[in-house]
Amino acid sequence: MNKIVIYILIIFWGISGFAQSEDLQRLSPTQDQSMEARLVAGLLTQYHYEKISIDDELSRIVFDEYVSSLDVNKHYFLKEDIEGFQKYRDRLDDHMKLGYLLPPYEIFNTFRKRFQERMDFIENELEFNFDFDQDEYLTINGDSLDYVSTPAELNDRWRKIIKSQALDFKLDDKADTTIQRLIKERYNRLAQTIGEYESRDVFQLYMNTFAESFDPHSSYFSPITSENFKIRMSQSLEGIGATLTSDGSYTKVASVVPGGPAFESK
């Protein structure tokens, strides 16, 4: 099945594409993104083959998918957060047509706040002296879980998550000090990734959720994401003459194109 991809290449004369200064804890949409949102809504309504209306029903789908994309296993949001977001559940369609993007940014900022609370818990409060002889149960599938009401309940859920990960390392004959270091390093890397999110990343995430709500084969690509997609599809960077492969979280040079810049620099 063909995949519908929306490419938006817009030049704004004299207008910065992003906010001048974005606080790490609070990201906000830009005027440019508001304009793009209205444009995407119009393009999807007019040209998508499904001819789906942007209405309350679609709004509920977008809401559920967006919240799930941030916290699919219910590890971060509290029940009060989700209840507070409910006022947007039937209104995202109208917001999209108007280019009003504050709600998805509010949801993301709350997610990042809750995420940081979890990282603080792992770093400063969690004791790694787990009793592996005690019978405990950890539900993995978020569909089988409810959002918890208090941070204390979330702490206990996370204690079991980390205990499960520690047990995996234990079965691999890792020492206790090594286990603690490896787990903290894992979440430090994740925290760095989340901390580096910019306004454009939140916009990309939300707009892609919106496009996929029309059908799973529709996507929104910003200009930067479009270029990255082309690179991934070709698995090469023509500019440097190198072919790349992925090795876990690292990118490796698989081969160098003869005669290219990378080859000449050898």
Predicted regions and their residues:
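Sec-dependent N-terminal signal peptides
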Residues: 4-13
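Flexible, low-complexity junctional segments that flank or bridge functional domains
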Residues: 7, 17-266
